[in-house]
């Protein structure tokens, strides 16, 4: 007994001290919680920065103090030490690799306990110079591949590499023919060319934060032996490792580069899966972003040219750093109770978990059991309080989780949770009265009514947690109820008064119903209740409460009367099927009634779509039935989509019509070597239901091509060339990997066929060169496709002509006639088609001023077989030389003999002036001063007049040989616009415009300048002869 009493006294003293200290501080005390922890740091050797700072800051009350460990040993701080503590940060002055490289850990402590931070490494970055030794020259046959070894100097961390050609900064670009490995730094040239001659140097760069350092090697000379460059199959030289390890979330880069002539094309594939959107492929490099375990597997790179192919395979193996799935949290536990804590971490390899208490390793002892990720306490004591950490680690990293354990010893206290003072209860109902004092250890609870001690009976229940439950309540149960609580720390009680009210009853319950999708329904619910209390109604569907404000308009209250709780269901959907419960409740009781609503509609989505028996054009699909939604399923349909389109398309099946009791069908007429997803839809008399989830992606098997390439044609090019063009075959029709084209061609009229294989699906032309090919020679050409599974059908034979030759014959009898001051007509006799070695496209007219060279001539081309042309844009009163040439796709032929023309003088620039008009009955007479041509102008042969009633009507042209004209006007004439201009050999002159308004009398416009047109309208009015003339000079 003496030991127990001493323990209780010690516990009371600790509790009183803790409570008093908290009251004095005004806030709860707690152990250190890290807000900033040290991070891995890379310090560049030779940096101008003279210190390194490792950060550490913890939230704690009282504030934490800090210590630091290096490689597990505590660092000593002092005024003369290179280590300083600034708040919680560790500052290392003049860091040196030999002394300071290592692992650092921050330790934070206050009165509540101690925690340690994650470990952070301090490493030193460096890059030494390349070796000073001269590098051997390299000699290779032109057309063959070559590799230059970088052999970088010692360094940390990894470098980036480029190569110099002859001098800085002439860097070699990565252009498909040349490749620089960022793993080794080596330079690869797939096929050497004459332009590759020169001296090569490896240029290595280190990037550490904002500090960049570069070094370059001695130059190595490349010389080429000139020979006829023969073609050869690819050979992969730059390879990614056989096993590439990566952590989840990282980006993986695989390198693959091959020698070959022609330069090989690189393709990537995953042998045990398909390409994903995370792939970024740029031929020699495959980048996979944000890798996960699904990216693990075997990858293949393929190098291919027209001479063959080479492949290489390697695996990507994905590991993961530790990551918490379940961690400990701050816990308050009663003295004498048991506690189990668990920490669970994921990672690959699987992490090991260890435990720390106040920064020190924790092992099993007495009441404490440590078992991997579990920590168990039996019969907690106050001394178990403190800071605990679980640490999960594998070879890729370490994670820490921290929590504070507070062991409590408290006398019962009702101040936070007293028994409710007034406890209303419904007659014949049930009442629950909690008793929840704060106490540690848990208190023993007794209940009394007045002075009567309550015990369990048919109507009275006291639960293990001290809650009092009274059932079948009557008026006699009213009175005072008191809860008494006691533990070894003390005792307390709390009292409430029970008041009995009338029970709530549902007088009209909802009825079950069946409806179709889209219909409306009202579920009825009426109730009676104690008039001294408010009544409310709530509804639930399958025990989930219905929120009328968030029902998208499908639910609403059907009445505002207090005793009526009817629920209106609007535009019912399948999701509205289920068991509806109406609950009428007051503050003291509630009562419920339920009914079932069945909503019939289209079937639900089928489940579990599985693809099997995959062929080249067929697959077998199976699925499981979905909900029929209370209407039998009549039939199924199957849809699919490919990697080429996101649009779902209905597929043909076997059987054609899939009955509603089926759970499997064959999909036919698929495209070979195509990635597909499938989904299944069910339908009944009410419509087509939602589709199933897509199946997993599959790829149909490969097959030989079944369609010949289209768009076969060609022609053009250089002399002695036959160019054959076609439309590249779409992915839909390639049917397999290794796709390409086989061309067959021969001179028309000969027997033997020449063939050529053109790899790559995107190819679209082939050039055949031979000195024996004459110009515009017809060839018979056929094409078919091939892939790894075989060859497809040949196309129909097309006629393609070799390159054309410029016409050898010139047009003749060329004539040119000046039409106006700036225009001429040219005509000629055509060349004979038989004289052409190509297709005549038309004729080219060249014209140049007398005194200019023919090379400066302007040119106009006609299309087709026309033998005349109208040329505009000439200078007036100018002599021109004109010649004509025939042209085709190869160019223009020889010129015809040139002919000469001289354009006429321009028309008079001055418009007609002193215009007057007289309106008499249905005729308007217009007069003007004659225009006299100047010496540099063409003669005046007459006048043109454009007459229109308004700005929207079509004009009428009148011709006059003299300076007056009579124009008939309609009886309803109100006004008109008239333009007058001179005409002659040089064309039409500048117009004058008159606006005529109907009225008796005359009107006149007098020109005020010889050289300038009137800029504004002039309006002239007289008394009874109201006359208006609106005159403007406009150029048509």
From Swiss-Prot:
Domain Fibronectin type-III: 605-703, 708-805, 810-907, 911-1003
Membrane topology: Lipid-anchor; GPI-anchor
Entry keyword annotation includes Ligase: no
Subcellular location: Cell membrane
PROSITE patterns associated with the record: FN3 (PS50853), IG_LIKE (PS50835)
Gene Ontology terms for molecular function: cell adhesion molecule binding; cell-cell adhesion mediator activity
Protein's GO biological process: axon guidance; cell-cell adhesion; neuron cell-cell adhesion; presynaptic membrane organization
Post-translational modification note: The N-terminus is blocked.
UniProt xrefs under CDD domains: FN3, Ig2_Contactin-2-like, Ig4_Contactin-2-like, Ig5_Contactin, Ig6_Contactin-2, IgI_1_Contactin-2, IgI_3_Contactin
Secretion signal span: 1-23
Superkingdom in the source lineage: Eukaryota
Keywords (A to Z) from UniProt: Cell adhesion, Cell membrane, Disulfide bond, Glycoprotein, GPI-anchor, Immunoglobulin domain, Lipoprotein, Membrane, Repeat, Signal
Regions crossing the membrane: none
Disulfide bridge map: 56-106, 150-202, 256-301, 343-390
Primary subcellular site in the record, as a coarse category: membrane
Disordered: annotated span: 889-915
InterPro entries associated with the record: Contactin-1_2_Ig1, FN3_dom, FN3_sf, Ig-like_dom, Ig-like_dom_sf, Ig-like_fold, Ig_I-set, Ig_sub
GO cellular component, one term: axon
Record: glycosylation sites: 71, 199, 456, 472, 493, 520, 770, 900, 914
Ig-like C2-type domain span: 32-123, 128-223, 234-317, 322-406, 412-499, 504-598
One Pfam family it belongs to: fn3
SUPFAM superfamilies, per the entry: Fibronectin type III (SSF49265), Immunoglobulin (SSF48726)
Family as reported in the entry's similarity comment: Belongs to the immunoglobulin superfamily. Contactin family.
Task performed by this protein: Axon-associated cell adhesion molecule (AxCAM) which promotes neurite outgrowth by interaction with the AxCAM L1 (G4) of neuritic membrane. Contributes to the organization of axonal domains at nodes of Ranvier.
This protein's name: Contactin-2
Classification of source organism: Eukaryota, Metazoa, Chordata, Craniata, Vertebrata
């Amino acid at each position: 007994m003496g030991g127990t009493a001493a323990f209780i006294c010690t516990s009371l003293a600790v509790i009183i001290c803790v409570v008093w200290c908290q009251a004095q501080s005004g806030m709860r005390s707690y152990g250190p919680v890290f807000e900033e922890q040290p991070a891995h740091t890379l310090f560049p050797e030779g940096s101008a920065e003279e210190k390194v700072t490792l950060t550490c800051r913890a939230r704690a009350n009282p504030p934490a103090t800090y210590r630091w460990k290096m490689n597990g040993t505590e660092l000593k701080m002092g005024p003369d030490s290179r280590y300083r503590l600034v708040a919680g940060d560790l500052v290392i002055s003049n860091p040196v690799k030999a002394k300071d490289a290592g692992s650092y850990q921050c330790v934070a402590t206050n009165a509540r306990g101690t925690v340690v931070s994650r470990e952070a490494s301090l490493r030193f970055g460096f890059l030494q110079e390349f070796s000073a030794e001269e590098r051997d020259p390299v000699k290779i046959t032109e057309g063959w591949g070559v590799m230059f070894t970088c052999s970088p100097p010692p360094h940390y961390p990894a470098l980036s590499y480029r190569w110099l050609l002859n001098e800085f900064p002439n860097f070699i670009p990565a252009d498909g023919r040349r490749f620089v490995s960022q793993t080794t730094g080596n330079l690869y040239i797939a096929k050497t060319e004459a332009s590759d001659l020169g001296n090569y140097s490896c240029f290595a760069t280190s990037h550490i934060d904002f500090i960049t350092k570069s070094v370059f090697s001695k130059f190595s000379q490349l010389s080429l032996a000139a020979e006829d460059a023969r073609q050869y199959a690819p050979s992969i030289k730059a390879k990614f490792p056989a096993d590439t390890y990566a952590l989840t979330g990282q980006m993986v880069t695989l390198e693959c580069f091959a020698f070959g002539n022609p330069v090989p094309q690189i393709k990537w594939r995953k042998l045990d899966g398909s390409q994903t959107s995370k792939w970024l492929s740029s031929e020699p490099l495959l980048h996979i972003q944000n890798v996960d375990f699904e990216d693990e597997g075997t990858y293949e790179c393929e190098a291919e040219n027209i001479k063959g192919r080479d492949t290489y395979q390697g695996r990507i193996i994905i590991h993961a750093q530790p990551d918490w799935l379940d961690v400990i949290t701050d816990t308050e536990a009663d003295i004498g109770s048991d506690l189990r804590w668990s920490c669970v971490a994921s990672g690959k390899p699987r992490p090991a978990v260890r435990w720390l208490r106040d920064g020190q390793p924790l092992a099993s002892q007495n009441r404490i059991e440590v078992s991997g990720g579990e920590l168990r306490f039996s019969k907690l004591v106050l001394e178990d309080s403190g800071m605990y950490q679980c640490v999960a680690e594998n070879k890729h990293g370490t994670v820490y989780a921290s929590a504070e354990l507070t062991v409590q010893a408290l006398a019962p206290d009702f101040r936070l949770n007293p028994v409710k003072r007034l406890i209303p209860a419904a007659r014949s109902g049930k009442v629950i009265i909690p008793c929840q004092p704060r106490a540690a250890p848990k208190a023993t609870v007794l209940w009394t009514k007045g002075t009567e001690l309550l015990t369990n009976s048919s109507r009275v229940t006291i639960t293990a947690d001290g809650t009092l439950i009274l059932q079948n309540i009557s008026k006699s149960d009213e009175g005072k109820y008191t809860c008494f609580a006691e533990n070894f720390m003390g005792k307390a009680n709390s009292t409430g008064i029970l008041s009995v009210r009338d029970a709530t009853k549902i007088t009209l319950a909802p009825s079950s119903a069946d409806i179709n999708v889209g219909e409306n329904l009202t579920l009825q619910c009426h109730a009676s209740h104690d008039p001294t209390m408010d009544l409310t109604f709530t509804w639930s569907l399958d025990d989930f409460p219905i929120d009328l404000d968030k029902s998208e308009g499908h639910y609403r209250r059907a009445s505002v009367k207090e005793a009526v709780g009817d629920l209106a269901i609007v535009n019912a959907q399948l999701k509205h099927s289920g068991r509806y419960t109406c609950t009428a409740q007051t503050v003291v009781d509630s009562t419920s009634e339920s009914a079932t609503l069945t909503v019939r509609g289209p079937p639900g989505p089928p489940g579990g779509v599985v693809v099997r028996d995959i062929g080249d054009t067929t697959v077998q699909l199976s699925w499981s039935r979905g909900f029929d939604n209370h209407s039998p399923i009549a039939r199924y349909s199957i849809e699919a989509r490919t990697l080429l389109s996101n649009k779902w398309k209905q597929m043909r099946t076997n059987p054609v019509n899939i009955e509603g009791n089926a759970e499997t069908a064959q999909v036919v007429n698929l495209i070979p070597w195509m990635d597909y997803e499938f989904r299944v839809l069910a339908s009944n008399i009410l419509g087509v239901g939602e589709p199933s989830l897509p199946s997993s992606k599959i790829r149909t098997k490969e097959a030989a091509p079944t369609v010949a390439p289209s768009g076969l044609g060609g022609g053009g090019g250089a002399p002695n060339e036959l160019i054959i063009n076609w439309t590249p075959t779409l992915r839909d029709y390639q049917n397999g990997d290794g796709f390409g084209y086989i061309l067959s061609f021969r001179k028309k009229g000969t027997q033997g066929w020449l063939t050529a294989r053109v790899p790559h699906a995107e190819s679209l032309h082939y050039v055949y060169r031979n000195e024996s090919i004459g110009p515009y020679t017809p060839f018979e050409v056929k094409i078919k496709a091939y892939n790894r599974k075989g060859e497809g059908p040949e196309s129909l034979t097309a006629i393609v002509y070799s390159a054309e030759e410029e016409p050898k014959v010139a047009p003749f009898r060329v004539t040119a006639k000046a039409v106006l001051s700036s225009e001429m007509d040219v005509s000629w006799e055509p060349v004979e088609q038989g004289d052409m070695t190509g297709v005549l496209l038309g004729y080219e007219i060249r014209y140049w001023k007398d005194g200019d060279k023919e090379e400066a001539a302007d040119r106009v081309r006609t299309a087709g077989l026309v033998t005349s042309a109208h040329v505009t844009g000439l200078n007036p009163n100018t002599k021109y030389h004109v010649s004509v040439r025939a042209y085709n796709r190869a160019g223009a032929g020889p010129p015809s003999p040139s002919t000469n023309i001289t354009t006429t003088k321009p028309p008079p620039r001055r418009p007609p002036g002193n215009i007057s008009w007289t309106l008499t009955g249905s005729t308007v007479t217009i007069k003007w001063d004659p225009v006299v041509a100047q010496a540099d102008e063409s003669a005046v042969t007459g006048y043109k007049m454009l007459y229109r009633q308004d700005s929207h009507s079509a004009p009428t042209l009148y011709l006059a040989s003299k300076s007056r004209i009579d124009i008939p006007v309609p009886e309803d004439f109100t006004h008109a616009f008239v333009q007058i201009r001179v005409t002659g050999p040089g064309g039409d002159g500048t117009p004058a415009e008159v606006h005529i308004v109907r009225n008796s009398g005359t009107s006149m416009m007098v020109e005020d300048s010889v050289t300038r047109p009137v800029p504004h309208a002039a309006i002239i009015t007289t008394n009874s002869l109201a006359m208006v003339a609106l005159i403007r000079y406009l150029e048509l």
